[in-house]
């Protein structure tokens, strides 16, 4: 790692070294989804500070007609679609080289969790200091947000562990597996809304709903989606929109595909059948537009920034929300708050044109902050951590034992990450909250994550003997 504070992202070199068979549409979908998330959060955030206490609102709640736009702009499923395709291709290559499930899952988890460990370590220190030094009523609403976006990492790890199952099912059953997943999601919603079962049943959909786009990505990787005529994709898109319109009109579901403050039901947390159908629509749209997207992404002027975004993806995703919190807090401390009012629901709404004018400076400060933080921290996303990446001296377990341990450890990490995303770091490390009838504590979840991470490394990590053999072979 360079001694400079800011290390340039090697975008041009990485773009030039792109393998000719790489699925650029998958990378483009991932980059587009990330940009919408990073830009969407700053646009939607509305903050008021009555008596010095931050109250968080949402621009979409202030103008309900805009919530229909989320039927296009909610593109988080594209992360899972792209990830499902990448996982399928990665597992195929690993399997062809004779690699086992545990070592493959460790390879995926190691790369994903490295920036998360750094994020949690820094945030835990900050949260502890804030808990000790700042008034709880001021700090708590903001510290609740610090881990909110970790839900993605938790859900993604869970569906990544299922990649071999998706691989086998997509090759044998094709799109029937997708219909089965949709049916399971619908059954969970039925149990939740119609049968009156405990709210905790809905937590199953954190796996099932996000498995839908991940499975669709596996279908893409194995050529199944490309085998369908374009008319079929148009029919899927139209049918998906129609089904969701009926579900929202006659069911308990809100219009918005993102969470709204104060709403009794969210399509995002826990996710619902509406979001699962939306994921299928997005997968069909990407398939329908595959040819023009490929041509677009062949252009160096387009492909270079896409490559750059993917190189810093986890850093950008994890750190943009803390930057947003910091900018909002600094603006308030400097007396530069955007003018807001408290709406009928008790949440802040923009107040006149002054809000728009103030937002120009707010967004500019946010963009500069995100740029600086990403440039500062992105090398850590790729730099090995000694306690995490170094080869182990212990013997490798047998493949069956390793597979079960790796799967269980990944599931534990995924579940604990979802727990931390729900609790936030307010009151860290002692605060416990109730979520869907379950007691959750962030410090306990982090401790379990660390233990499960050690188990995953033991099951699939490199060994010292293997590393020495590789070096000897290279020298020869």
Locate each region found by the language model.
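Alpha-helical transmembrane segments and their immediate juxtamembrane cytosolic regions
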Residues: 2-476
């Amino acid at each position: 790692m360079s001694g400079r504070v800011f290390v340039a992202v090697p975008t041009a070199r990485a773009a030039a070294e792109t393998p000719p068979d790489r699925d650029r549409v998958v990378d483009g979908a991932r980059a587009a989804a990330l940009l919408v998330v990073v830009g969407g959060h700053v646009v939607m955030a509305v903050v008021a500070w009555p008596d010095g206490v931050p109250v968080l609102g949402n621009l979409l709640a202030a103008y309900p007609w805009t919530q229909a736009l989320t039927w296009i702009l909610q593109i988080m499923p594209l992360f899972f679609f792209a990830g499902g395709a990448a996982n399928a291709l990665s597992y195929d290559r690993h399997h062809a080289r004779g690699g086992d499930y545990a070592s493959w899952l460790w390879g995926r988890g190691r790369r994903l969790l490295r920036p998360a460990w750094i994020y949690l370590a820094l945030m835990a220190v900050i949260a502890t200091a804030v808990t000790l030094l700042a008034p709880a009523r001021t700090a708590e609403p903001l510290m609740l947000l610090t881990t909110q976006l970790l839900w993605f990492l938790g859900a993604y790890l869970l569906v990544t562990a299922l990649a071999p199952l998706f691989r086998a099912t997509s090759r044998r059953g094709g799109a029937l597996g997708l219909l089965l997943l949709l049916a399971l999601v619908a059954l969970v919603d039925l149990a939740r809304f119609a049968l009156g079962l405990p709210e905790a049943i809905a937590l199953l959909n954190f796996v099932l709903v996000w498995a839908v786009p991940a499975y669709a990505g596996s279908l893409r990787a194995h050529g199944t989606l490309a085998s369908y005529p374009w008319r079929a994709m148009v029919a899927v898109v139209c049918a998906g929109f129609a089904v969701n319109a009926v579900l929202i009109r006659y069911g308990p579901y809100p219009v918005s595909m993102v969470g709204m403050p104060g709403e009794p039901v969210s399509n995002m947390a826990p996710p619902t059948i509406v979001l699962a159908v939306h994921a299928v629509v997005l997968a069909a749209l990407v398939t329908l537009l595959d040819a023009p997207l490929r041509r677009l992404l062949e252009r160096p002027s387009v492909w270079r920034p896409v490559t750059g975004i993917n190189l810093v993806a986890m850093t950008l995703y994890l750190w943009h929300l803390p930057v947003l919190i910091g900018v909002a807090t600094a603006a308030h401390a400097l007396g530069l708050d955007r003018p807001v009012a408290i709406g009928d629901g008790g949440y802040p709404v923009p107040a006149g044109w002054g809000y728009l004018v103030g937002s120009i400076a707010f967004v500019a400060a946010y963009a500069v902050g995100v740029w600086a933080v990403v440039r500062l921290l992105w090398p850590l996303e790729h730099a090995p951590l000694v306690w995490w990446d170094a080869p182990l001296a212990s013997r490798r377990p047998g493949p069956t034992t390793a597979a079960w341990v790796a799967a269980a450890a990944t599931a534990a990490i995924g579940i604990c990450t979802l727990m931390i995303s729900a609790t936030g770091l307010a009151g860290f490390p002692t605060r416990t909250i109730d979520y869907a009838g379950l007691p959750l504590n962030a410090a306990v979840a982090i401790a379990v994550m660390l233990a499960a991470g050690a188990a995953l490394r033991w099951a699939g990590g490199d060994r010292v003997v293997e590393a020495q053999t590789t070096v000897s072979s290279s020298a020869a």
